[in-house]
Design a protein with these regions (language model features):
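Amphipathic, small/basic residue-rich leader segments at the start of a protein or domain
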Residues: 1-86, 93, 97-117, 129, ...
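Short helix/loop capping segments that flank catalytic or ligand/cofactor-binding pockets
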Residues: 58-60, 106, 128-131, 160-162, ...
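Short, solvent-exposed loop/turn segments at the edges of secondary structure
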Residues: 86-90, 115, 131-133, 163-167, ...
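Beta-sandwich/jelly-roll carbohydrate-recognition scaffolds of carbohydrate-active enzymes
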Residues: 106-110, 122-141, 157-158, 177-179
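Short Pro/Gly-enriched beta-strand edge/turn motifs at strand-loop
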Residues: 116-122, 151, 202-207
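Short Gly/Pro-enriched turn/cap motifs at secondary-structure boundaries
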Residues: 126-129, 158-163, 182-183, 211-219
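A short core secondary-structure module
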Residues: 147-204
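A glycine-rich, basic-preceded beta-loop-alpha segment at the flavin cofactor/substrate interface
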Residues: 200, 205-207, 221-241
Length: 241
């Protein structure tokens, strides 16, 4: 089936221009996206294909996204990761479906403009597709002001975009010994949003690049020791714990 005119125009216009701007060899050699290329991507909606227009997005059909990703992926693994993750495993889609109004209004416009670069922290040394085996832990507690927070300890690896990300969607198993959330002592696995550099994240460390299958795209480990986040950083709010 043919794409709608506006989607075909994006494929024939900005996508082709992006591939002309970026030097595939230099991207592979340096493992870095030049500032002008990143700005072009942000200005032209490459990070916004999974976000509704009301939040500054540029929603695309599944067919169009597939065509765009296939073309970009045929040129560069780094460019591919920068397009694919924000429009699939990034925070945008699940926030759009399940986020609170406050989360949508705060995160989605920044994701659409590339101010937040997302990654999804699931894979661990002993857990990947078997997500139920993850060992990342979050302990629910009240701070000195009585605010409910989580203390997170985790070791993730092979996380695509981790070396360049500043917004982590972290899969973690919660323990609530005082039943502060009202869901028992073991609420289970949830996803918590962590902003790099936010107060309480001093124990967050993003390591060097991995090189999966020899490709030089941003992929690396994330380690957290006593990282503190508020309970409202659960994607979708505390009811999704």
């Amino acid at each position: 089936d043919q794409l709608p005119a506006h989607e075909q125009a994006f494929l024939d216009g900005p996508v082709e221009e992006l591939l002309k701007m970026a030097d595939g060899y230099e991207l592979s050699r340096t493992r870095k996206l030049p500032d002008d290329v990143f700005k072009f991507m942000a200005d032209n909606g490459f990070f916004a294909m999974q976000i509704a227009k009301e939040y500054g997005g540029m929603p695309m059909s599944t067919q169009a996204k597939s065509c765009i990703m296939a073309k970009v992926s045929s040129y560069s693994g780094l460019l591919s990761a920068m397009v694919v993750i924000p429009n699939s495993l990034g925070a945008a889609e699940l926030l759009g479906h399940y986020g609170t109004d406050e989360q949508k209004n705060y995160y989605l416009p920044k994701l659409a403009k590339g101010e937040f670069i997302p990654c999804f922290g699931l894979t661990e040394p002993t857990a990947g597709s078997d997500a139920a085996s993850l060992k990342a832990e979050g302990v629910v507690f009240k701070d000195d002001d009585g605010e409910v927070k989580f203390k997170l300890n985790f070791r993730k690896r092979y996380i695509t975009l981790a070396p360049v990300a500043n917004l982590i969607s972290l899969a973690v198993r919660l323990h609530d010994p005082e039943n502060l959330l009202g869901k028992g002592e073991e609420p289970g696995i949830t996803v918590v949003l962590i902003e790099k550099g936010a107060p309480g994240t001093e124990g967050l460390h993003i390591g060097d690049h991995h090189q999966p299958i020899g490709e030089h795209f941003p992929n690396g480990p994330i380690v957290g020791r006593d990282v503190i986040v508020a309970a409202d950083k659960v994607r979708g709010g505390v009811e999704y714990t």
